[in-house]
């Protein structure tokens, strides 16, 4: 096994084709981290000219100290049963990490627990310290240890039927409601950033500046690994739909009124149907007024939600999502999610990753809402083997490990204060 010098394109091709590859190991992802003070180095190992393992090493300076952390996010990208390749990757990583004065090498492989026996054993044998099997969104991890993934390698009907029944009904309703899902461009990031600001204010979290999203889009869109989707509501088109539905409801009432006059047996049923139709008419009249007001203010329509969809080979990722507070009954997020899944499938993806979660948290948990949303999309829990640290400077490592929990508690307090506002 030997060190190899490969191009960025060769690195990315290996990551995208490997079962343990991940978005965070793409070279263009490293470009997005520069804004937050990270810089990258890359390594590759192989035999007879054939690459057998790669890793993208991210480095960040420790504040006020001449040291760095070496972080291999969702790496190494290698077959973890291949001890020789794994050992060669560690040797290469150590060489660079020491040159960059790293106090530790942190990895969190994209390897699931039920397939991770070799990885656990071989990493520990090499001297890695396992950080344990904590909850998926534990503050002790950089990346979530658990994510929710929908298999999307199926036709439209099979995909829809994989969703939980109630969610399936919501998706069907969203498709009828009259929103339009657009694959947008860089200009659309302005709208997305505005929607993200609204979402942050509603849900009580700090949001990123538009430059952050532009950075991701600029780095990854050219290779087809980042797409922006926006959901639009056209008032004129939907007023026409509401008028049509009102006409149908009035016709239905007339039909049941006629049946009441001709059949006493059907009188009770007819009255119930008439009452139901009248309730629907009242709701549609309210909706029509709202849409007419919207048409006066925004005749071109408004955007209700948006999301960034990412790719790494056969894996797709719902990275960021945002939504308006208006017209939520149109279920724009349901329309968008289903559309993005189909788009991802049509562009070679077999899985759709909703991102981090805990495993079936209690209803009073701050993470319950995430779990409840993600579990209805035909997802399974992807439980990773977690984080591992290879310690290069034991005294500094111990000091930082002692300080980190205090910093985490401070961040949690700030987050909770924001949510209470």
From Swiss-Prot:
The keyword Transmembrane helix does not apply. Keywords: Acyltransferase, Antibiotic resistance, Cell shape, Cell wall biogenesis/degradation, Cytoplasm, Peptidoglycan synthesis, Transferase. It is an enzyme of class 2 (transferase). Its EC number is 2.3.2.16. Its main location: cytoplasm. It comes from the Bacteria. GO terms for molecular function: aminoacyltransferase activity. The keyword Transferase applies. Catalyzes the incorporation of the first glycine of the pentaglycine interpeptide bridge, which is characteristic of the S.aureus peptidoglycan. This glycine is added to the epsilon-amino group of the L-lysine of the membrane-bound lipid II intermediate (GlcNAc-(beta-1,4)-N-acetylmuramic acid(-L-Ala-D-iGln-L-Lys-D-Ala-D-Ala)-pyrophosphoryl-undecaprenol), using glycyl-tRNA(Gly) as donor, in a ribosome-independent mechanism. Involved in methicillin resistance. This is Lipid II:glycine glycyltransferase.
């Amino acid at each position: 096994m030997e060190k190899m010098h490969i191009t960025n394109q060769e690195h990315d091709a290996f990551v995208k084709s490997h079962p343990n590859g991940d978005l965070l190991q793409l070279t263009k992802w490293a470009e997005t981290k520069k804004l937050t003070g990270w810089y990258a180095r890359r390594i590759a190992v192989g035999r007879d000219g054939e690459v057998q393992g790669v890793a993208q090493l991210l480095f960040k300076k420790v504040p006020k100290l001449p040291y760095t952390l070496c972080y291999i996010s969702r790496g190494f990208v290698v077959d973890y049963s291949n001890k020789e390749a794994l050992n060669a990757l560690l040797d290469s990583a150590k060489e660079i990490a020491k040159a960059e004065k790293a106090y530790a090498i942190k990895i969190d492989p994209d390897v699931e627990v039920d397939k991770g026996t070799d990885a656990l054993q071989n990493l520990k044998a090499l001297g890695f310290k396992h950080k344990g099997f904590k909850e998926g969104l534990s503050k002790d991890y950089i990346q979530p240890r658990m994510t929710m993934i929908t298999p999307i390698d199926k036709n439209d009907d099979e995909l829809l039927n994989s969703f939980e029944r109630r969610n399936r009904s919501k998706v069907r309703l969203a498709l009828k409601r009259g929103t339009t899902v657009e694959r947008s461009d860089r200009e659309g990031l302005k709208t997305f950033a505005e929607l993200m600001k609204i979402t942050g204010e509603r849900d009580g979290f700090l949001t990123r500046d538009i430059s952050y999203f532009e950075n991701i889009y600029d780095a990854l869109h050219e290779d087809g690994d980042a797409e922006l989707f926006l959901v639009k509501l056209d008032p004129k088109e939907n007023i026409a739909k509401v008028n049509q539905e009102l006409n149908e409801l009035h016709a239905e009432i007339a039909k049941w009124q006629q049946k009441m006059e001709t059949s006493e047996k059907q009188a009770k049923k007819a009255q119930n149907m008439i009452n139901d139709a009248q309730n629907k008419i009242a709701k549609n009249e309210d909706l029509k007024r709202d849409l007419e007001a919207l048409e006066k203010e925004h005749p071109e329509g408004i955007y209700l939600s948006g999301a960034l969809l990412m790719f790494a080979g056969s894996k797709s990722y719902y990275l960021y999502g945002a939504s308006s507070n208006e017209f939520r009954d149109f279920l724009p997020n349901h329309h968008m999610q289903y559309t993005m899944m189909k788009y991802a499938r049509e562009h070679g993806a077999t899985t759709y990753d909703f991102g981090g979660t805990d495993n079936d948290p209690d209803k009073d948990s701050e993470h319950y809402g995430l779990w409840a949303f993600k579990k209805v999309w035909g997802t399974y829990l992807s439980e990773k083997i977690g984080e591992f640290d290879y310690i290069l400077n034991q005294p500094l490592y111990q000091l930082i490990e002692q300080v980190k929990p205090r910093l985490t508690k401070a961040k949690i307090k700030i987050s909770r204060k924001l949510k209470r506002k």
